[in-house]
Amino acid sequence: MSKESNKAQEPQIEETEAVAVETEVVEDAASLMDELTQANFRVEELEQALAAAEAKVEEQKDSVIRAAAEVENVRRRAAIDVEKAHKFALEKFANELLPVIDNMERALQGTSSEDEATKAIYEGVELTLKTFTSAVAKFGLTQVDPQGEAFNPDHHQAIGMQPSEEFPANTVMMVMQKGYMLNERLLRPAMVMVSQGGASVDTQA
């Protein structure tokens, strides 16, 4: 083959090689784009799965929080119910004790420590009453004995009013029956006689 013929074929060979290289590059690029597309799809799938998992975790966390709150509410309501039941039972029991205390106080009023015939009885009842009131005080039962105090309609029940030079107006001048508080709540008001103050002056005399 002549040199001229070889030279004529060289551009064709180079062009063919260039086309082959370009084709290979295009195919590689296409393959790479396909891999990138698949990778993007996979990333999206993983992101969706992660979002779903996070949502599930939040849902479960919220359920746990609600369950814990409900348990706490049930525990609180149970504690309140127990406290109410305890107070009601104690209040009922205390109301049953009040007549016993009243009777012992009347027994003391009907006897005298100065009278030898009743001195032993007086001292025995007095000691019993003192011990009894001290015992019930441990459970929150306290007396309302407002002798000489200002009349308080929240704790006292007036059974009458009388003029008095000794006591100012609206002052408890006599306690007919002591009242009682149970854990700072009124159990029974004190029955009292209230002073009207000094007798009015007759200006026409």
UniProtKB/Swiss-Prot annotation:
GO molecular function, one term: adenyl-nucleotide exchange factor activity
Keyword terms, alphabetized: Chaperone, Cytoplasm, Stress response
An annotated GO BP: protein folding
Cellular localization per UniProt: Cytoplasm
Keyword check for Chaperone: yes
InterPro entries reported in the protein's UniProt record: GrpE (IPR000740), GrpE_coiled_coil (IPR013805), GrpE_head (IPR009012)
Tagged with keyword Transmembrane helix: no
Coiled-coil annotated residue ranges, if any: none
Source organism superkingdom: Bacteria
One Pfam assignment: GrpE
PROSITE patterns: GRPE
A GO CC annotation given for this chain: cytosol
Purpose: Participates actively in the response to hyperosmotic and heat shock by preventing the aggregation of stress-denatured proteins, in association with DnaK and GrpE. It is the nucleotide exchange factor for DnaK and may function as a thermosensor. Unfolded proteins bind initially to DnaJ; upon interaction with the DnaJ-bound protein, DnaK hydrolyzes its bound ATP, resulting in the formation of a stable complex. GrpE releases ADP from DnaK; ATP binding to DnaK triggers the release of the substrate protein, thus completing the reaction cycle.
HAMAP family: GrpE
Quaternary assembly: Homodimer.
Similarity comment text for this entry: Belongs to the GrpE family.
Protein name per Swiss-Prot or TrEMBL: Protein GrpE
Source organism: Shewanella loihica (strain ATCC BAA-1088 / PV-4)
